[in-house]
Every structure is written in structure tokens, then in C-alpha cells.
């Protein structure tokens, strides 16, 4: 079976639409339809039911989903195995949001290379949608993200709780969105909580889908936005940014996702190191919080 057909099938499943699937894999909608039709002819069954609400799997489609994932992952694993660089024993592809590469995954990377020097690592940055697709297809071994989706054959594990604080270039910043406020799109859950806390917020002049982009704009031009505390901590210490004390703090969990089929020592070892870095990071944050509280009591 052509793995391209299986990949197209999985993309339609993930997106819930032939149109969206075509956009994701950069082909026409008719090409997606033709590939699915060819696949259905080869399997001798109908895989999707299309209606106004989108595309839904049939019973046969749900059965084939597991096999399609296995097929694509097997091919990708074969590419990994035959493509191991000389001098290394194995390869590892790790993908994460750019905000999670900052501080957290970069610390993990240094520890991983020290602990497993014979593993060739490919580091990638992407948003959740692309990371999940890479995991389903087997192109990515480990994904680190904020809002993973439930997929057959994938394990999702909580790493740590991200704290999003309203940080401003002004020491007396407003406790709600005002002039110069940059809305960072941290995902649908953040949007829902943000809307509930700030019901009168009409909308931002600037929206950034990546925290790093919004942060650079604020530092360059002034303003405020909700950013991960662990990332802005050095900027808070240097007084380039200030936490708006009366503003709400949003908690956002960070997860590690990997295939249940991958039980290789280096994959499990990489995840164990991620747990260790997350634990150390959480402990450091708790210690900083305790110091601040002690300082407030003294003053």
C-alpha cells in the first residue's frame, strides 16, 4: 500500500475535513478525494461519511486508523534506522513549541547529549497541530506541547504547570488589557479563561501566535502581555519587565507526547531527563516564590 494514501487518510482524520487536509498537505481538494477513493477501492470499504458538519469515520475507517498509523510509523522508523549518521547508535527527533524550547527544552538538550552522546538528535519547533501530525505519522519521536490531542497509540504525560503572568514594561502597569497590550494566542483554553476574566475586552491591536514574538514586540516598543514566568524571570530580575501584581495568573500545563510503540532505551531515557528538568524547574520556581513572600513579610 502506498504510504502517501495512508498519510492523507490520517491528515483527514486529524483535520476532520477534506478541505483542511488539502491545505495542510499542500495539495488540491480533488487530490485528497482521489487518494481517499483509491484507498477505499483498495480496501473494499467506505472509510468516511461526508456531511455538512465535516467528515466522520465509518466503523471500517476507525478500524483502519490504527493500521494506517502503524504503517506510516513503520516506514518512518525504517528511514530513521537506515539514516543513522556514522559514529552514532541511533536517532531521536524531538519537536516542541518554541516557547518550550526556551529555557526548558534547551536545558533538556544539554543534559540529553551529556547522558547519551551516541544519539543523533534532530530538534524541531512547531505548533501543536503539526507536532501531533508528526507524532501520528512517526516523523517525530517525542513532542512537547501545551494542548495535545488524544490519538490512538500515543501516550500523553503532564510535565509541569506553566504560569502565565501579565508582564509590563511599566512598573505601574494596568491589571487588565490596555494600550500596548499584546494578546498571545496560547490556545483555546487560554482564550476561554481570558474571555471570562476580561469580559469587556473588545479585542487587541496586536495578536501573536507565538509568545516569543509578542515578547520581543513588547520589549522593543513597550506594552504588556501574558507570558510564561520561567521565560521572563531574567527580565523581571533586571527590571526590564514588571509583573502586574493585581492581574490574574493563568496556569497552563505542558505535556510530553510519544508513541506507545516506541519503548527504545534512548526514547525512554530522553523522557526521564525531561521529567528531571521539569522537576528542577518547578522546585526553582517554588523557591523564588518563597523568597518573594519572605521579602514582602520583612518589608
Feature-to-residue mapping (PLM):
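Interdomain hinge and pocket-entrance segments immediately C-terminal to HTH DNA-binding domains
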Residues: 82-101, 115-119, 162-163
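C-terminal effector-binding regulatory domain of bacterial HTH transcription factors
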Residues: 192, 229-238, 247-299
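Short helix-boundary/capping micro-motifs
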Residues: 10-28
Amino acid at each position: 500500500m502506498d504510504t502517501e494514501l495512508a498519510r492523507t487518510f490520517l491528515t483527514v482524520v486529524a483535520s476532520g475535513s477534506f478541505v483542511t487536509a488539502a491545505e495542510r498537505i499542500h495539495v488540491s481538494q480533488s487530490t485528497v478525494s482521489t487518494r481517499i477513493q483509491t484507498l477505499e477501492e483498495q480496501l473494499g470499504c467506505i472509510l468516511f461519511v461526508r456531511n455538512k458538519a465535516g467528515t466522520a469515520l465509518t466503523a471500517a475507517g476507525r478500524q483502519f486508523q490504527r493500521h494506517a498509523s502503524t504503517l506510516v510509523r513503520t516506514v518512518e522508523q525504517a528511514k530513521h534506522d537506515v539514516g543513522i549518521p556514522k559514529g552514532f547508535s541511533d536517532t531521536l527527533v524531538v519537536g516542541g513549541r518554541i516557547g518550550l524550547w526556551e529555557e526548558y527544552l534547551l536545558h533538556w538538550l544539554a543534559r540529553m547529549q551529556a547522558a547519551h552522546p551516541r544519539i543523533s538528535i534532530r530538534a524541531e519547533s512547531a505548533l501543536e497541530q503539526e507536532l501531533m501530525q508528526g507524532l501520528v505519522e512517526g516523523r517525530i519521536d517525542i513532542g512537547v506541547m501545551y494542548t495535545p490531542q488524544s490519538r490512538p497509540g500515543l501516550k500523553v504525560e503532564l510535565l509541569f504547570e506553566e504560569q502565565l503572568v501579565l508582564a509590563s514594561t511599566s512598573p505601574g502597569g494596568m491589571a487588565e488589557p490596555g494600550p500596548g497590550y499584546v494578546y498571545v494566542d496560547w490556545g483555546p483554553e487560554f482564550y476561554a479563561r481570558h474571555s471570562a476574566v476580561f469580559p469587556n475586552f473588545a479585542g487587541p491591536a496586536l495578536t501573536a501566535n507565538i509568545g516569543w514574538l509578542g515578547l520581543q514586540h513588547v520589549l522593543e516598543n513597550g506594552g504588556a502581555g501574558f507570558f510564561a514566568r520561567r521565560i521572563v524571570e531574567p527580565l523581571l530580575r533586571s527590571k526590564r519587565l514588571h509583573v502586574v501584581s493585581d492581574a490574574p495568573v493563568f496556569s497552563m500545563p505542558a505535556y510530553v507526547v510519544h508513541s506507545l510503540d516506541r519503548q527504545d532505551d534512548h526514547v525512554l531515557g530522553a523522557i526521564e531527563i525531561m521529567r528531571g528538568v521539569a522537576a528542577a524547574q518547578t522546585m526553582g520556581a517554588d523557591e523564588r516564590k518563597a523568597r518573594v513572600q519572605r521579602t514582602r513579610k520583612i518589608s
